C-alpha cells in the first residue's frame, strides 16, 4: 500500500514501560485495534450494496445530463459546479466535526457503523490508506443515494421542456453529489504520500481537492480545527470566524456535554 504519515503532530509523553508495551498512535494502539475489530460482515455488506447502487445511479444520471447539455447552459453550469464543490466542502466539515466532536461508539446503530471510523482515524491516521475502495467510500455512497434516486426519478418522469429549465440546478446537485460521494476517497489521498496518480497530485497541488499538507493541520491533537475534507477551501475562513468553536460553546452550554470527550477516551486506551 502507498505510504502515509505516521501520526498526529503532537504526542504526549509516555512512561518507559508504557512506551515499551504500546505505541501512542498507529495500528498497534490498543484503542485502534479494538475499533478495527468492530468492522463487521454486516457493515461490509451494507457498504457493497451502497457502492454498487450509488455508482449505477451516477452513471444513469450522468448519461441523462450529457444528453440534455446545451452550450447556452455553460455559464450557469460552471457556476453550479463551483457552488456544488463549496457546499460539499462545508457539508463534509459539518459531518466530520459532528462525528469527531460528539457522540460515542457505544450509541445504538450509528456508533459502531459511523462514529467508529472517526475514532479509529485519530489514533491510527494511516488506517484509511489500508482500506479498500468499498470500505473507504461505502458510507458516503449511502449518504448520496437519496438525492441520486430523486434525480433519476425526475429524468424518468419530467418532460424534456421541464428538464431543460431545471438543467443548471440539476448540474449543481450532481456536482454536489460527486464531490460528496468522493469526499472520503479525497481524504484517503490526503494521507497517502507515495504512489498517487499524477492527476491526483496535480489536483492536490492546485487545491482543487484537499491537499496533503493542508490536512495535516487537522491531525494535530486535539483535532479541533480544519474539518472540511473535500476541497479544504472553507477551512481557513471558518477558522478565522471561530465557526466550529462557537458551535461547540453553544452545544456545551445547552447540553453540558464536553467536546471530543469520547475521542479522547479512545486515544487514552493503553490496553
From Swiss-Prot:
Gene: PEDS1
UniProt protein name: Plasmanylethanolamine desaturase 1
Motif annotated as Histidine box-1, chain positions: 187-191
Membrane-spanning ranges: 48-68, 75-95, 162-182
Pathway(s): Lipid metabolism; fatty acid metabolism
Family: Belongs to the fatty acid desaturase CarF family.
Motif stretch (Histidine box-2): 214-218
GO cellular component, one term: endoplasmic reticulum membrane
Site feature location: Essential for catalytic activity: 96, 121-122, 187, 191, 215, 218-219
GO biological process, alphabetically ordered: ether lipid biosynthetic process; fatty acid metabolic process
Organism: Bos taurus (Bovine)
Superkingdom classification of source: Eukaryota
Localization, UniProt: Endoplasmic reticulum membrane
UniProt membrane topology term: Multi-pass membrane protein
Catalytic reactions of this protein: a 1-(1,2-saturated alkyl)-2-acyl-sn-glycero-3-phosphoethanolamine + 2 Fe(II)-[cytochrome b5] + O2 + 2 H(+) = a 1-O-(1Z-alkenyl)-2-acyl-sn-glycero-3-phosphoethanolamine + 2 Fe(III)-[cytochrome b5] + 2 H2O; a 1-O-hexadecyl-2-acyl-sn-glycero-3-phosphoethanolamine + 2 Fe(II)-[cytochrome b5] + O2 + 2 H(+) = a 1-O-(1Z-hexadecenyl)-2-acyl-sn-glycero-3-phosphoethanolamine + 2 Fe(III)-[cytochrome b5] + 2 H2O; a 1-O-octadecyl-2-acyl-sn-glycero-3-phosphoethanolamine + 2 Fe(II)-[cytochrome b5] + O2 + 2 H(+) = a 1-O-(1Z-octadecenyl)-2-acyl-sn-glycero-3-phosphoethanolamine + 2 Fe(III)-[cytochrome b5] + 2 H2O; a 1-O-(9Z-octadecenyl)-2-acyl-sn-glycero-3-phosphoethanolamine + 2 Fe(II)-[cytochrome b5] + O2 + 2 H(+) = a 1-O-(1Z,9Z-octadecadienyl)-2-acyl-sn-glycero-3-phosphoethanolamine + 2 Fe(III)-[cytochrome b5] + 2 H2O
InterPro entries on file: Lipid_desat (IPR019547), Plasmalogen_desaturase (IPR052601)
Keywords: Endoplasmic reticulum, Fatty acid metabolism, Lipid metabolism, Membrane, Oxidoreductase, Transmembrane, Transmembrane helix
